[in-house]
Structures are given as C-alpha cells and as structure tokens.
C-alpha cells in the first residue's frame, strides 16, 4: 500500500446529511466501499453543526480556511477552531498528513453529480480530468470571486468538491447516496491508477468557468421581488443566451440576461440553491470551455502521489 493518504470529508455543512450517513455505514461495514488499496482518512467536517441539523454554528466552515484566518489568534467562531483542528491533524504538515482532500456535499439545486475545483492548481485539474473522463461529470471552476473564498480543500496540495443533487437539506435520499458512492469509487480508482502508473489521461478537459454571481431583483426593503424564471428553474448546466429571462415577478415583469454578444452562450449553475439565499446568490453564471490537458498538470499530480 502506498504511503499516500486521501482525506474524505463529509458534513462540512451540518444539514447535508447524505455523505455523513454513508460514512457511518462504511464504518460499520468496511467492505461497502472499495478503497482501491489507498490509505483513507474519513472525517466529519462540522460534527457540532451536523448534530444540530444546521449548516453551521457561527459561520460557514467552507469559507473558514483562508490563510489569514488560520494564522489569526483573534478569532472565536466555532468554525475557526474546527478549521484549525482539521488542518493541524490532516493537513500536509499535520499529525496525520494527507495529500489529497475530497469534500462531499449535497445541493438543493439540480446539479446532478458534479465536481468543483477552486482556481487552476495543476494537480486538481489533472485528477478531475481523469474522473470526468471516467464518469462524464461536469466541472465547475470557481475563481475570481473574492467574496467567496477560504474553501476547505484549498488547504491541501490537491483537492476538490463532489456535489450531488437535488436533495432538500436534512433529507436522506437513496439516489443521492448511490450517486455519491459511484463518484467516490471513481475518485479512489483514478487516484490508485495514478499511484500505480496505470493512468491514461484524456486529451481535453471541459470546465464551466465561474464568471459572476447573480442576485434576485429586490425591492426597496431588500426582499426578493421576483422568482427564478420557470424556464431555467431546475435546469442547471443548460446554456442560455443574451436576452434569456432569469427572473419573473408575479405581475409578469421579466429580468433578462444582459451579458455578452447575442449568440454567446452562458451556463447557470447552483440555481436557487437554498443555502445561498443568505449570501444573496440566486445563481452563478459560467462559461463552458474546453482545455487541453497540460503536461504540467500531469507532472504535478504524479510528483504529489509518487514522491
């Protein structure tokens, strides 16, 4: 067995209960999941929030891993201390160091199974290209959004998020569990292939690059004055063009997409995600792009997993 360790995180948000439930079943029956001969560490990201059945206690744990927050001694939120605990125990220089972190989430949006990467770290892009090639999952590349930062997986040399939906918060769902299992198996299989030099990389990677967040239209008191338009509700990953309706009020007033040229396509994701209401995000707008898989991506991942 390789000395490489992979950290699997569930329950980073305490009201996303499917992956934590799956981890508990795995603990009771270790043959449930094929580890592909990889050293695995599993952890509940925010156990207190999970016990309380809410997204977080004091602040979003998945926005609490900024370096300035981790280095600060003047913080008192429960999630600040939890972020420090996780990095101290499982970070690359921790007591039980892991090289890759995979953070399992669920979403109320119709995202299906998808992967999320933050920025353009070569090793991240290499591993998700393999998983996409195996399962065909869409990839959301989140970058250039200073208001949303400090994500858990960024504290590890390589890491990404698995999102599965739609499912209401706090609800166990058979299909969500199955999709999570399928994606987890693919993740571990592809990591094992890299470690054992059995990898065949695709020529290209398809990403949906983050452009901007879009809020609901609001009235003078800050209350949403329109609803997500019926033609895009539940249609994450479907392209739309300039002039397409995004929102509609009860009186029929439309808010249109006014972005780019007339024929340019954009792809909305995380449409009407319940957890993002507090962040004033009704959806995120992305641009679908096809990138050639680069040698430096492959080399970085190989060096990380075969030191």
Swiss-Prot record:
Query: Entry cofactor note text?
Result: Binds 1 zinc ion per subunit.
Ligand binding (substrate):
55, 62-63, 163, 276
Q: Which Gene3D superfamilies match?
A: 2.20.25.160, Zn peptidases
Q: Which Pfam families match?
A: AstE_AspA_cat (PF24827), AstE_AspA_hybrid (PF04952)
- One GO molecular-function annotation for this sequence? zinc ion binding
Q: What class of enzyme is it?
A: hydrolase
User: What family name appears in the similarity comment?
Assistant: Belongs to the AspA/AstE family. Aspartoacylase subfamily.
**UniProt-recorded name of the protein:** Probable aspartoacylase
Reactions catalysed, semicolon-separated, are: an N-acyl-L-aspartate + H2O = a carboxylate + L-aspartate
- Give the record's GO CC terms: cytosol
Record-linked InterPro entries: AspA/AstE_fam, Aspartoacylase, AstE_AspA_cat, Aste_AspA_hybrid_dom
Question: According to the UniProt entry, what is the EC number of this protein?
Answer: 3.5.1.15
State if Metal-binding is listed as a keyword. Answer: yes
Provide the cofactor list for this protein.
Zn(2+)
What keywords is this UniProt entry annotated with? Answer: Hydrolase, Metal-binding, Zinc
